[in-house]
Amino acid sequence: MSNKKAVILVSGGLDSTTALAIAQSEGYECYTLSFDYGQRHRVELEAAQRVSDKMHVAQHKVVQLDLKSIGGSALTDDDIAVPEDGPEGIPVTYVPARNTVFLSIALGWAEVLNAEAIFIGVNAVDYSGYPDCRPEYIAAFQKLAMLATKVGVEGKPLQIKTPLIDMTKAEIVQLGMRLGVDYSATVSCYQANVDGEACGRCDSCRLRRKGFEDAQMEDPTRYAN
């Protein structure tokens, strides 16, 4: 067992699962963290558990959050439809402050575990335009981690690792395949049905499908239509 630990934010989707595989390839003992935050696509929690089991992580933790009560996103508010037309600008699927909340909790757990790093599968190339997926956001949170934690003050700051941030979706798929990721276990769709079948029309589905097409890899995604 490795003597270096990492917390991996795992949604059950393509990117976060690849980030987990990268962390394992770098020799980290991995602790996966997922959130039940009132999201529309709750089957992602089943996928996160499935991925964590298949990849034999040290521990998988699910934290309960009530972001649904805040609303403001198509992923947490049933009255806001998930767009299927590739809108310009920041889409309504953006969940206000989500990555800030997630990373803050990951930071706390990482301190408790005496972990060295937190991995998050954000991407700023083939992505939906979320402000909390950009390199400058991650750099700002890294500064916060150095200032707001005991380990940071003591000169042993946790590293926020974003191995996918400058990669295309095709490059992510290709790397994951080389690392042995089983993408059939993952769910990326914003409105997947209870059987985990993807809609094939939302922005997340389009990006995922394009990634497999550009990588010239077979897409194992189960689509409802």
UniProtKB/Swiss-Prot annotation:
Pathway entry: Purine metabolism; 7-cyano-7-deazaguanine biosynthesis
Keyword terms, alphabetized: ATP-binding, Ligase, Metal-binding, Nucleotide-binding, Queuosine biosynthesis, Zinc
Molecular function per GO: ATP binding; ligase activity, forming carbon-nitrogen bonds; zinc ion binding
Catalytic class of the enzyme: ligase
Database matches in Pfam families: QueC (PF06508)
Domain of life of the source: Bacteria
Amino acids binding ATP: V10, S11, G12, G13, L14, D15, S16, T17, T18, A19, L20
The protein's Enzyme Commission number: 6.3.4.20
Positions of Zn(2+) binding: C189, C199, C202, C205
Cysteine disulfide partners in this protein: none
Catalytic reaction annotation: 7-carboxy-7-deazaguanine + NH4(+) + ATP = 7-cyano-7-deazaguanine + ADP + phosphate + H2O + H(+)
InterPro entries per UniProt: QueC, Rossmann-like_a/b/a_fold
GO biological process: queuosine biosynthetic process
Keyword Heme: no
Cofactor binding remark: Binds 1 zinc ion per subunit.
Cofactor(s) listed: Zn(2+)
Family stated for the protein in its record: Belongs to the QueC family.
NCBIfam families assigned: 7-cyano-7-deazaguanine synthase QueC
Function recorded in the entry: Catalyzes the ATP-dependent conversion of 7-carboxy-7-deazaguanine (CDG) to 7-cyano-7-deazaguanine (preQ(0)).
Name by which UniProt lists this protein: 7-cyano-7-deazaguanine synthase
Gene designation: queC
